[in-house]
Amino acid sequence: MNATDMDTEAAFRNDHETIAGEDPFAMFGEWLELAHRKEINDANAMALATADPDGLPNVRMVLLKGFDREGFVFYTNTESQKGVELAENMQAAAVLHWKSLRRQVRFRGTVNRVSAEEADAYFVSRARASRIGAWASKQSRPLENRTALAKSVATEAARFGISDIPRPAFWTGFRIVPNCIEFWMDKPFRLHDRLVFKRSHSGEPWSALKLYP
């Protein structure tokens, strides 16, 4: 079922629907489109999990900024905690949970940097203040106070003036290339519907199976 064909209350009738499909990326696109219509804020927000060198996981919310048949893309400062952890361990997992839909999608796999051209194209699409912020913020490092951050922003704004703001070398995008994608739909009495797609490597066909809730 295409999300655009669903009436405004369809998301709340999970009780009578089941998850079905053969193409996880197409299914994700339909669910995300519906979420953009129903969620109050940031339907593309996802919890991203990485791990430090000791294997201790860290998780934080980031924004999914794109997806295609290769994977799911987000952007960050490479000197941030997640950037440093990804440099050591290029694997990650993420989940998007939509309370208004009573649905979620989670995926995991290897992580690759996007091309410089792709990162540049996205960076230039950001608001000018956000581009300045990318230069001003020493992400994940100690901050004395908000005044110090404001001064850093002012310094970078003065440095660039009205000129173009290039993408910092320490700021780029990452693509999670999934080997597992699971769709979850809430059902009464915790008898939820789960459909998982798996593959060994990118480009291989997906196998799909239902899971007990």
UniProtKB/Swiss-Prot annotation:
Cofactor(s) demanded: FMN
GO molecular function: FMN binding; pyridoxamine phosphate oxidase activity
Cofactor: record remark: Binds 1 FMN per subunit.
Keyword terms: Flavoprotein, FMN, Oxidoreductase, Plasmid, Pyridoxine biosynthesis
Record-linked Gene3D superfamilies: Electron Transport, Fmn-binding Protein, Chain A (2.30.110.10)
Binding site for substrate: 65, 122, 126, 130, 190-192
InterPro entries membership: Pyridox_Oxase, Pyridox_Oxase_CS, Pyridox_Oxase_N, Pyridoxamine_oxidase_dimer_C, Split_barrel_FMN-bd
EC number: 1.4.3.5
Catalytic activity: pyridoxamine 5'-phosphate + O2 + H2O = pyridoxal 5'-phosphate + H2O2 + NH4(+); pyridoxine 5'-phosphate + O2 = pyridoxal 5'-phosphate + H2O2
Binding site for FMN: 60-65, 75-76, 82, 104, 139-140, 184, 194
Pathway: Cofactor metabolism; pyridoxal 5'-phosphate salvage; pyridoxal 5'-phosphate from pyridoxamine 5'-phosphate: step 1/1; Cofactor metabolism; pyridoxal 5'-phosphate salvage; pyridoxal 5'-phosphate from pyridoxine 5'-phosphate: step 1/1
Domain of life: Bacteria
Family to which the UniProt record says this protein belongs: Belongs to the pyridoxamine 5'-phosphate oxidase family.
Xref: PANTHER family: PYRIDOXINE-5'-PHOSPHATE OXIDASE, PYRIDOXINE-5-PHOSPHATE OXIDASE
Function of the protein: Catalyzes the oxidation of either pyridoxine 5'-phosphate (PNP) or pyridoxamine 5'-phosphate (PMP) into pyridoxal 5'-phosphate (PLP).
NCBIfam families named in the record: pdxH, PRK05679.1
Protein name in the entry: Pyridoxine/pyridoxamine 5'-phosphate oxidase 2
Organism per entry: Ralstonia nicotianae (strain ATCC BAA-1114 / GMI1000) (Ralstonia solanacearum)
